[in-house]
Curated annotation (Swiss-Prot):
Part of the 30S ribosomal subunit. Forms a tight complex with proteins S10 and S14. The keyword Signal does not apply. It comes from Mycobacterium marinum (strain ATCC BAA-535 / M). One of its GO terms (biological process) is translation. Residues 38-106 form the KH type-2 domain. InterPro entries: KH_dom (IPR004087), KH_dom-like_a/b (IPR015946), KH_dom_type_2 (IPR004044), KH_sf_prok-type (IPR009019), Ribosomal_S3_C_sf (IPR036419), Ribosomal_uS3_bac-typ (IPR005704), Ribosomal_uS3_C (IPR001351), Ribosomal_uS3_CS (IPR018280). PANTHER family: 30S/40S RIBOSOMAL PROTEIN S3, SMALL RIBOSOMAL SUBUNIT PROTEIN US3C. Residues 238-275 have a biased composition (Low complexity). The lineage of its organism: Bacteria, Bacillati, Actinomycetota, Actinomycetes, Mycobacteriales. Binds the lower part of the 30S subunit head. Binds mRNA in the 70S ribosome, positioning it for translation. It comes from the Bacteria. Belongs to the universal ribosomal protein uS3 family. Coiled coil: none annotated. This is Small ribosomal subunit protein uS3. Keywords: Ribonucleoprotein, Ribosomal protein, RNA-binding, rRNA-binding.
Length: 275
């Protein structure tokens, strides 16, 4: 189940929060439709701005929209002209006063939505999909808060006649663990062969009691007690086959010859001592 469902919806109220915060009784359907229109308006007009997330909060007579972007200069525009235009469009759409907050994303390489958008842009520019996926994984794994990432591309990869899905993964991505902080992003690349869907899952550690675990990852088996080797030498293995020195016919023949040679070597000494 955790492999198929959206990680955000799967963990709502546990480790993730709602992206739209408001209460309505009879106007619930209208507000949901309005939220979808707001997100569609922001995503269609600001493709190059690198929008990672859009949060909407409503009061009785005001709508607050928080835009998390990697390039705030594009959203603000010269002397704030672009921000004023966006605010006017949102007020026309909602019919209420809009408070627009533009927030900068500090680490774009650790945001799943921005990583998916970056891979999709490379696919649109005819970059090989395997190279784009590996480059995104390497950039994300350099971030200290990223413990695992999975990137998946689906569609006519490389212009093939039949569509397929391929993914690369590095580190841990526990999709079925509810306390795991999984960031998820989806973006579509428009190519000459059709659309290619890009999905990204990023694991950022576990959240226990509302706090993220900041302890360093302990290597597997580091806390396991070390067993002391008993005194004496182990039988030597011969080659990569894993056989011991006496595990073959030749080894047993050599082993039987060694005691006879030892007896013949010690017999003269014993005779000299007796005499």
């Amino acid at each position: 189940m955790g492999q198929k469902i959206n990680p955000h919806g799967f963990r709502l109220g546990i480790t993730t929060d709602w992206k739209s915060r408001w209460y309505a009784d009879k106007q619930y359907a209208d507000y949901v439709k309005e939220d979808v229109a707001i997100r569609r308006l922001l995503s269609s007009g600001l493709e190059r701005a690198g929008i990672a997330d859009v949060e909407i909060e409503r009061t009785r007579d005001r709508v607050r929209v928080d835009i998390h972007t990697a390039r705030p200069g594009i959203v603000i525009g010269r002397r704030g002209t672009e921000a004023d235009r966006i605010r006017a469009d949102l007020e026309k759409l909602t019919g209420k006063q809009v408070q627009l907050n533009i927030l900068e994303v500090k680490n774009p390489e650790s945001q799943a939505q921005l990583v998916a958008q970056g891979v999709a842009e490379q696919l649109s520019n005819r970059v090989a999909f395997r190279r784009a996926m590996r480059k995104a994984i390497q950039s994300a794994m350099r971030q200290p808060n990223v413990k695992g990432i999975r990137v998946q591309c689906s569609g006519r990869l490389g212009g093939a006649e039949m569509s397929r899905s391929e993914f690369y993964r590095e580190g841990r991505v526990p999709l079925h663990t509810l306390r795991a902080d999984i960031d998820y992003g989806l973006y579509e690349a428009k190519t000459t062969f059709g659309r290619i869907g890009v999905k990204v899952w990023i694991y950022k550690g576990d959240i226990v009691g509302g706090k993220r675990e900041l302890a360093a990852a302990v290597p597997a088996g580091a806390d396991r007690p070390r067993r002391e080797r008993p005194a004496g030498s182990r039988p030597r293995r011969s080659g990569a086959s894993g056989t011991t020195a006496t595990g073959t016919e030749a080894g047993r023949a050599v082993g039987s010859e060694e005691p006879a040679a030892a007896e013949s070597a010690t017999t003269p000494e014993a005779q000299s001592t007796e005499s």
